[in-house]
């Protein structure tokens, strides 16, 4: 299935173009997340602490079928600023298994990494589906938390900092944090299929987030250095998985 993509940095648009694009993003997002709080997307896109906001939009036969809003947030700490990348991806049901979407996000992130090589760049996101967790964890050994592998201390410090920005967080182990998220519109049959294929990664996710189907998300983290990004991109491209 051939997908065309367009990438735009929301932060670089004029006020008028931002308004037009935001309305388009909001309309599509509402199709996938009908239960989301209306101001949620607005707060993400117009957050003054977001320093870059690349948006990838996917098309099939001229029709938009998915979008990935990548927000890079600057956080001030006692030592040096941290740059936290998060992603809000929304796809029509027939297009949710396209690995190319991850490859596109890696490519955009790598461009930012090369442009600002001295910045501490982290990916922190709450994953709400076992298959999505498996997609990330199987592409890089530096993606945490993961089965039977201790999380490095610097990862845990950043994760602890970020979990304090959420509400109703549950700590289920030293390195496992979960909290309520907004699920995409999904049928019960689709939820079952999300965990049909047993694997080391899916088993780990199900062990710690068995209540994902009611909206609990597992907080995950990965340090986005050039080596990690290149390794993940190569693994996605070759269809290769890591334990």
Briefly describe each language-model feature range.
Residues 69, 84-88, 106-110:
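Contiguous, well-ordered alpha-helical segments that form the cores/surfaces of helical PPI scaffolds
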Residues 88-97:
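A short, internal acetyl-CoA/4′-phosphopantetheine-binding micro-motif in the GNAT/acyltransferase core
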